[in-house]
Swiss-Prot record:
It is found in: Cell membrane. This is Olfactory receptor 1J21. Belongs to the G-protein coupled receptor 1 family. It is a multi-pass membrane protein. It comes from the Eukaryota. The keyword Glycoprotein does not apply.
Amino acid sequence: MMKSNQSTVSEFILLGLPIQPEDQAVYFALFLAMYLTTVLGNLLIILLIRLDSHLHTPMYFFLSHLAFTDISFSSVTAPKMLMNMLTHSQSISHAGCVSQIYFFLLFGCIDNFLLTSMAYDRYVAICHPLHYTTIMSQSLCVLLVMVSWAFSSSNGLVHTLLFARLSLFRDNTVHHFFCDLSALLKLSSSDTTINELVILTLAVVVITVPFICILVSYGHIGATILRTPSIKGICKALSTCGSHLCVVSLYYGAIIGLYFFPSSNNTNDKDVIVAVLYTVVTPMLNPFIYSLRNRDINGALRKTLSRRLCSH
């Protein structure tokens, strides 16, 4: 712990999840199962898309990158949380904390841009079907992913460098299960005005703008469906956009609940629980949402399994 009211720190203490000590073993088993499901489920989607040529389309190109990002995003926080629960240790080094901040922001930001790219892909597929292959070219898809990585890397680097310059802290006890930037800034006795201003500014670009783009895309999709109302058209739109809408609702629902309805108490238990939703639960559910009732994914899985069985 800290020896004075203001000093430098070499490590932080992560208080973890708001659970009783006697329940640690149960929650460890639960979160380990969820993390393994996240990794294996998303890896399966990546492999199926790579192995089946019928899935080499813009939609599945973005989905494979989203699956990789989900694995990475969950891996930033879950292994350390599980290790702390297993060893009953709560410490993380200052360097480890800085690294966690960077990669958390990196993959979280990429998630936003990939979901936006997928919404645009669905918009073009439904609203401009005749020009779909021309608009959604391979070069555009690669460019969108590259821009997502470049901007997300810059965003994470800016926040990380601004945090690293903070030298004095009133306390080193973090009321979270990972190094959450907002929770860490509350502990600093240095001036965090610039940090908070940059967070607000970049949050508009990273969260608000992509969310608005997604809403606009689905607004146009809805208008297109209403102009040509038919059971077949509605079913096609639902099968095409339903899974993506579910993922967007889960992801942005958690973010809106966390940042637009913040906790009024100091323990921030609600913030920790909501963080579990978008760092552990949502990445785990995404493979099930995208594969459930998805004939292309299910067909690719059956084809791959039958090939493996026949080879033996």
